[in-house]
Amino acid sequence: MKQLGLLIRLIIGIIAGILIGMCGQWFGIADTAFFVTIIRLLATFTSLFSTFLSFMIPLIILSFITVGMAELGKKANRLFGLTLLLAYGTTVISGLLTFFIGKAVLPGLIQPITGDVLESNAFEPLFTITVDPIFGVMTALVFAFVLGIGMANLKGDSLLNVFRDLQKIVTGVLSRIIIPLIPIHIAGLFANIAAEGRLAATVKMFASLYAIIIVLQLLYILSQFGLASIVCRKNHFKSMKNAAPAYFTALGTQSSASTIPIALNCAYNNNINSDVADFVVPLCATINLNGDTICLVLGSMGIMLASGMNPTFAMFTPFVFMLGVTMVAAPGVPGGGVMSALGLITSMLGFTDPMQQLIIALHFSQDSFGTATNVTGDQAIALIVDKVDRSASEK
């Protein structure tokens, strides 16, 4: 099973969960003790997993954002500042544009799910365990920013190395426990939804969001190369052809970091100065997560609409700006975007545990396309930085 890609395992989990949940209706055993016990066992696993995930979220935020902010601060130079500004700016713009498009399109496609599937829990867990997080999400964010900025201005790396070790521990928990168990977690979620008879509405919501997200990601790639063409005063849409290998590699790896060698070769083929490419491409693999931003903003809006909530501009504007900071500091690894942003989604948008499970499922299911959007956008940013660097050198 581990040899299968994460996307394949996730699809298997969704299908298995649906099949298990539908058995009650298909075979007329919905009210039997055996079927109810199976669903409640899955609900128990989902509950325990959610509790553990809630415990880990502040640690994920603290470790990744603290180290990310500190390391970015220590790299400060002219090219770094420009690259960081472009990455953050395009992330915020992608989030805001996605919000406006979502407000125009989603209400006509997604209706509140009857019976509020996102809150109901007809099949209670057999037992629950309460594990309180070490501190709250916003506390973790503020603490991470203070420590990160502070360590960036320290001469020594002693404290930074402590948090690097913490990051390694958290990364190990993510890669060896949380991410491998996500398919089982999602299977339990969909089994519960199917057993409650609300599968059709949920699948319709997922299909609508999935299609719109991918279209928006592709359009945003075009817009980034359009911006590069304007800034560089040269038609860089042709450069997209050279960037294609990075896009398709990322579809398979689901990791911006793992795609760096291919992305560098693409940058060289686009005649980007090697010094600029060697600096910008690896940096953007960590700080430029536009594809994740589009998914998280639109996915959150869709899930809120399905649960009867109203995603407002006043609610999403601060969320998008905070999400931009979080995405800049998030790791370029599978699931890094949603895991880093989950705290914001919970605290600023009011997501409940079932809603969190759905945004995790949606994000992981399209993570390949989101990552491909990220690495292709990196090429456009590299083109702009290269143009600015050449112009500055000529002066």
Enumerate the predicted regions with their spans.
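Helix-loop-helix junctions within the multi-pass membrane cores of secondary transporters/permeases
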Residues: 245-327, 381, 389-395
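Alpha-helical transmembrane segments of polytopic integral membrane proteins
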Residues: 17, 58-66, 94, 98, ...
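Juxtamembrane helix-boundary/capping and inter-helix hinge elements in multi-pass membrane proteins
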Residues: 69-78, 152-157, 165, 196, ...
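Short amphipathic alpha-helical coupling elements at transmembrane boundaries
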Residues: 40-51, 161-176, 242-249, 265-269, ...
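Transmembrane alpha-helical segments and their short flanking loops
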Residues: 297-395
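Signature of multi-pass transmembrane helix bundles
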Residues: 1-12, 16-26, 30-34, 38, ...
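Hydrophobic transmembrane alpha-helical segments of multi-pass transport and channel proteins
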Residues: 52, 88, 92-96, 214-218, ...
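The feature identifies polytopic integral membrane transport proteins across all domains of life
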Residues: 45, 80-84, 113, 235-251, ...
